[in-house]
Amino acid sequence: EVILQLIFEKKIDPKIIKQKYGSGHELAIKHLTNSQLSYLFNLPSQRTVVLNDISFQLNHGAPWDQDEYLYPDTKIKTLLRCNSINHNFVLVGHSHYSFYFDCGNSILINCGSVGQSRKKGGIANWTLIDTNNKSYKMNDCLAKFCP
């Protein structure tokens, strides 16, 4: 979490970040230990996880550039760059816009955001993936009414 680290190192003003993103970063610094913060700062930019023989590539942004945003209306040629012969699912975030795209060998999914959806304020987005049959379901609800 680059923004969190910059706030922690006093390289950016937390008030500016709070105006744009809310108080999550401030709460993290207040309530997490230095060890927990260090863990977050040193997470890999990309990771592979296998559950029930289903392979997931985890990314914050695009697989080739974690700072690149992918949107539902991103050009197909760009989305196809996410195709992976080594993974069943390629999971991305960063844009907070929920969408999925069948890349051929893998399914690209951005589940959106529970707390900061960019599609519509107050809507929580998430995705459930069934590792028994490789099915997935994208979900959303009004955040205050979510189960």
Task: Give the positions of each predicted feature.
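Acidic, His/Gly-rich catalytic cores of divalent-metal-dependent hydrolytic chemistry
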Residues: 102-147
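Active-site neighborhood of divalent metal-dependent phosphoester bond hydrolases
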Residues: 1-48, 54-58, 70-85
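Active-site-proximal beta-strand elements of phosphoester/diester hydrolases
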Residues: 55-62, 108-112
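Short, acidic/polar N-cap/turn motifs at the starts of alpha helices
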Residues: 44-48, 97-98, 124-126
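Short, solvent-exposed coil/turn segments
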Residues: 42, 51-52, 104, 122
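Active-site environment of divalent metal-dependent phosphoester hydrolases
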Residues: 1-6, 66, 91-102, 116-121
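Anionic-ligand binding region
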Residues: 73-109
